[in-house]
Amino acid sequence: MKKLLLEAPILTRSGYGEHSRLVFRALKLKEGIELFINPLEWGSTGWISEETDERKEIELGIGRFGALMDQANQTKQDPGFDYQVHVGIPNEFKKKAKHSVCVTAGIETDRVSSDWLMKTHQGLDKLIVPSQHAKDGFTSTSYEVHNTQTDQRVTLICNSPVDVVPYPVKEVTPAPLDFTIDTTSYPSPF
């Protein structure tokens, strides 16, 4: 069984919290992985408090993560994650597995920061974004940087493949409303 670390603001009431739960729902269907969850904060947003079956599944993953990290700390060994999925902004990413993916919404402009591009040179194996616009922000941005140790100028570009995976759309069939409104009891304003 492969160990997969999901680092995400999965319990927050935020856009990234909802995105994290979408990723969780997809990952839990994948056979052959053991899911460990590190619940991250997202600013000062509150956390979901409802006790649902999904919440219980998330709590199990959080418990597995805590137990594994306790064991790793006691034995002074690496927890040995095979895969890491980090949901959030790229500058928060730190590589913790053999294969690492960052799922991010990107940014609503035509370029990303140099800090985000630097992360693609620091062990980020793939970026997943929800739109072509977000992908273009990563793949079209470049910066000229000066390496003060070598005195060379180089161009900083995205060094990871970027895949577009749009948000799913839930089809809802509205239930018919069965009610009548009696408007005869209201005086006419005319």
Predicted regions and their residues:
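N-terminal subdomain of nucleotide-sugar transferases
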Residues: 1-44
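Hydrophobic anchor at the start of a short beta-strand
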Residues: 33-35, 100, 162
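Hydrophobic residues at beta-strand termini and immediately following loops
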Residues: 38, 103, 165
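Nucleotide donor/acceptor-binding cores
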Residues: 2, 98, 190
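Conserved donor-binding/catalytic core segment of Leloir-type glycosyltransferases
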Residues: 5, 184-190
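Short, glycine/charged-enriched secondary-structure capping and boundary segments
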Residues: 19-21, 98-100, 115-118, 141-144, ...
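Extended catalytic core of nucleotide-activated donor transferases of GT-like folds
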Residues: 5-7, 46-137
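Donor nucleotide-sugar binding/catalytic pocket of nucleotide-sugar-dependent glycosyltransferases
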Residues: 125-186
